[in-house]
């Protein structure tokens, strides 16, 4: 059974179609990259999966549950299965790194002694020193902010991670280390990762499969090893200047 299924998923706002009849399944332990030009609906798709907005038509199944049928309380429980890493990192500026990571754990009523253990555990997992816990977001580099956001997202040990443009705004060297971290987490935790990006370099680094969104439609899905057989002109354009080892 797929971990997440999108069934005839359609979303529009004020008459403008953002996503049109998307059918797609995500498997346990895979990293699926969603690519496409700006405004094609990539980030909207993540917001739909998280339940932050509701589909106009169609539905999403998570672990076999039709999310259209969930109450607000049930949605809150389901979201604990998903960690979200936003493009901006979305850290609380008034909290230090420790409290940013601990925030969700405290809302989940975890004992403070266990919270402390978990905070330092996830800091280690994402490659941050324990001393970073006392730093404020304003004192962090872009890469450190992103690692903190990832640490917060995995603190609850969710089986699903959603990344919205995780390397945007980072220099190429730092971006590459974040891509390495995404790969490491997928292997270490056997999680299902969905990564939205417009960067073909990042996509090729982390993806098991790549889906291309264009003008509200899912126009192509390819295994990483089968990209040499891409058919859609836009996918070919993304790949044109890269030598693929497949």
Show the residue positions of the predicted features.
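Conserved ABC ATPase "signature" C-loop
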Residues: 215-216
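Helix-to-loop junction immediately C-terminal to a conserved catalytic motif
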Residues: 50
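Short coil-to-helix segment of the ABC ATPase nucleotide-binding domain corresponding to the Q-loop/switch region
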Residues: 95-102
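Conserved catalytic motifs of ABC-family nucleotide-binding domains
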Residues: 157
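Conserved ABC ATPase "signature" region
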Residues: 66, 113-131
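Catalytic Walker B motif of ABC-type/P-loop ATPase nucleotide-binding domains
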Residues: 161-164
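Conserved ABC ATPase signature
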Residues: 136-140, 144
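ABC ATPase C-loop
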Residues: 153-154
